[in-house]
Amino acid sequence: LTIALFEVVASLRLTGTFDPEEITAALCRVPTDQWRAGQAGPAPKLRRRSDGWVLESAAGAGHVGEQVDRALDELAPISDRLRHTLSARETSGCLCVAVDTDGQGRPVIALSAAALRLLAASGLSLDVDVVSGATDNPDPATPVIQAASTGHPDGPFHRTVVSWCAEDAVSAFLDEWPDRSMASQDRPGGEILVQAEMSVGSFPSMYFHPHLLARLASTAMSLRIETCPRTT
């Protein structure tokens, strides 16, 4: 199976109530951008509602999962400092991943078990935003999203939800996963596959809260998100 390459930009974004210079000192990293609440935003008439600090990795064409791994490799040395910074301040942190398809396909979001562990250890959320560039109006119908696992010893385990959010399917899956009582080191690994039936130009919301990433990391499984054409 050939997975298409797309332009991907990953960035660490911290927002909340803090002095950006203190974040720079705590993480020992020079930000790509920073701002204080009340400063002008991207549009002249908009004002920032919170303080912000952004560290962007270089943009590049590649598989989405590989680019996420690259960004996390850069964050790995400061994972402990990052988690302490988030817990010690009124601050939330997110690894934001922008994927530009230029209307040329449907990206596959593949996250390794190691990537999920590092995200969980750092206390970050994950937000994958797909920019399709499609000119067609997206179908407003709510998509059907299925989550299945190859990691259960008794065979595949499935859950289906009707939602715009991939997080809902993963959460419903984990709530009833038969292996949830097992210790992660005793689990056989495997993959959680999320498939969303979408119209052309539409993609599910792929925002994952820190607590759900921690639950995912505890399964010792990887996560794969695919979109496929709507069948009805």
PLM regions with names:
Residues 1-232:
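Acidic (Asp/Glu-rich) sequence patches and key acidic residues
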